[in-house]
Amino acid sequence: MKWGDARRSDNVEDVRGAGGGGFGLRHLGFGGTIAVLGIGWLLGINPLQMLGLMSALDSGAPVPQQGHAPPGNDAQADFVRAIVGETEDVWSALLPAQGVPYSPPTLVLFSGRVQSGCGGASAAMGPFYCPNDQRVYLDMGFFDEMRAQLGGGGDFANAYVIAHEVGHHVQNLLGIEDRVTQARRAGQRMQGGEGLSVRLELQADCFAGVWAYTRSSGITGWKRATWSRR
């Protein structure tokens, strides 16, 4: 995956080294589970292998979570800025065409623990989006764990995770998050294979696919032919 020439986003905040240490439980959150399954499907990885990865990540083993300050020349942060910039370019072109202005989220890089608009969180949760402050939170250690368990994921797999979380921001801008919240309060089923939680995550995967397609094939023709068919 070539990303070196991509525009770097200014909407990345690096607070690594500012969080507290301690120990957490190794647990892959629900959104992270769907994102990892989506990556496996795209890369042609056996679903049983993916389930093995999630079982390992969800083992409940204590994992040390120490905050470390980033190096001065941080290639990982540069990669994240490039991918966030790509998602900004894609969605700032697609959403206004549907009458929805696009305001990009801020992606927060943290290590160990972080305080979000949705409350305190640790790296054990995996990457997540908080609609209250419209921010994506990412501990880069998630990529290391995913790479170690999969035997290699690469830049595309990492970028897909970021695009998936940005997909939740797109849902928020489209009012989908609010509609799901209203449905939950009305007693609609959230859990299970047909539940709204799974559907919400699968749609975020779909939006990540929009990014993946347009970064390689361009926006113009696909935007008119496909995005409008909702």
Task: Annotate each language-model stretch with its function.
Residues A6-G21, L25-R230:
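A Zn2+-metalloprotease active-site environment signal
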